[in-house]
Structure formats: C-alpha cells, structure tokens
Amino acid sequence: MSPLLPQKKPPPPPQDAAISLAWEAAHRRRAAICAWVAAALTIIGSILSALGTSSVPTFPNDVVTAPDAINNLLAGQPIPPGRTAMQVEWFQSHLSAANYVGTVMSGLAALVLFGVIAFLFKATRARNPGFGQATLIAGAFGAVAFGVGTTVAQMTSFIGIAGFDGGNNFQATEALTAGPVVIGQILLTLGSFGLGFAFVLLGLNAMRTGLLTRFMGILAMIVGATFIIPQVDPQGVLRSFWLAVIGFVFILRWPGNRIPPAWISGKSEPWPSIAASRAAKAGASDARSTPAPSLPEPESTGSGDTAGQLRKKRKRKK
C-alpha cells in the first residue's frame, strides 16, 4: 500500500464488560420507565388528538370548482363556502379540550423517546465500538424536532380552526396553513427522518450484537419506517408495542427468562443466522434419529450350539 494513502484505523476494542454492566444496571430502570411512558403517551395522545374528529364528512354537494368561482366573481356574486370551508366549520364544532391534550401528549412522547434511544445506543456501542455516533445525534435531533413539530403544527392548526369565522375555501385554507403550521410541519418532517434513521440503525446493530432478538430488531426497523411513512401506523400502535416490550427487556424481565444473553455477559453475542439455526436444528434432529449401536450376535457353530454352550460341554467332559 502506498504511504501517501491514509491508513485505515482499526476499530477500538469493546468496552470492559464489567464497566458496561455497571452503567446499565444504574440506568436500566430509568430507560424502562421512559419506554413505558413513551408507549402510553403515544397511544393515548393519538386517540385523544383525533377524538370526535376522525370522521370528517366529505360534503360532496358543496364542491366549488375554479370555473364556478370565476363565474361568481364575474357576476358580482359571493363565492359559496365550498367543501373545505364546510369541513373546517364541522371540525370547529367538534373540537374539544381532549384534542389539545392529545397533541401535547404526542409531542411529549417523542421527547421521552430519546431516553430509550440513548440507553440502547450506549449498550450497543459498548459491545460494538464501531457503531457510529451519528445514530445518537439523529435520534436526539429527531426526538426534539418531531416532538416540537407535532405540537406546533397541530396546536396552531386547531387554533386556526377555532378562530375561523366563516368564508370560502381560500379563507379556510389560510386558517389551516398559517405560518406556524408550515414551520411545525417542516420540523415534523425533519424529525420523522431523524427518528426513522435512528430506529433502523439501532434495530440492526442491537440485533447484531445480540441485545435484541431478530423479532425485536426487525420490528424496530419497521417502526423506523413508520416515522417516514406514517400511513403504515397512523395511531402509533406498532411503536407503542415495541416500546412496551423493550421496557421489560431493559429490566431483564420476560416470561421464561428468555432475555438475550448479551445483556447478561456485557459482550457481543450475535444471534445465529437463519442458515446456522436450521443447520443446528437439523444436526440435533439427526442425532435423535440415529439408532443406538446394536450388540454383536453370539458366535454359533455348525451344530447350532453357541460358544458358551460348547465351553460348558468341555467342562463336563473333564
């Protein structure tokens, strides 16, 4: 290799297992509480924020097209309210305090979520020092941006709806897309990508080090995808389920004590690949099906007597 080319540094050695386990023991309960609180806030917040407003009528007979609006203007007539304005008025009549409370809870859920990300990142990096800091940075930025963006976008949208005093579609759209709403939506989008990136990398690397089972690791990556494509899990059910389960994993409590061994040893203990698992199962099955070796048959003579019977006859003759 040319001396002019930069030498690739070897990865640092894993952190001492005793140090890792001591740190995890001191912080695992706090991380588990963060997971359970985030799960509860996510599911309850999504229900409350949509309470009474999830089935907005379509008002198909109140659609105002562009030609209709132009004709009304040319004739000196006011533009009729239109479907968007009718929907905003309907939403206004169904808006309640529960919607505001649910929005705040959803925003807080994202902030609390960072406690889960930080703990799992620290535990994973202790067993795999090559795991980059970018995941933690993306998780921190994503949690703040997602939480603030959710709260700002929905709260200002609710305020705009509550202050709507009638009008046409244009005025209704202005009420729904005021300046703070747009800023909140931008933050929400950026935060979604940050959390999605963090969850996918955390799920993959925690699974590789043996901290997460294959099911939990793959589910973490799916949860990351739902941040970017919220239509897959609009109520956050998958996210809440994963958070509730990971809380029990953090405190090493699970039925049958089926906790991943890496949490106990403090070292990386990767899960075997699917091919290796199948080979191990096949080997165990072959071992069970192999018959035990049979004992050799006693030697016989032409007269039909066994060797033992012949020895007895010789003794009698003597």
Language-model features, listed with the residues they occupy:
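Hydrophobic, aromatic-enriched alpha-helical segments typical of multi-pass transmembrane helices
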Residues: 2-318
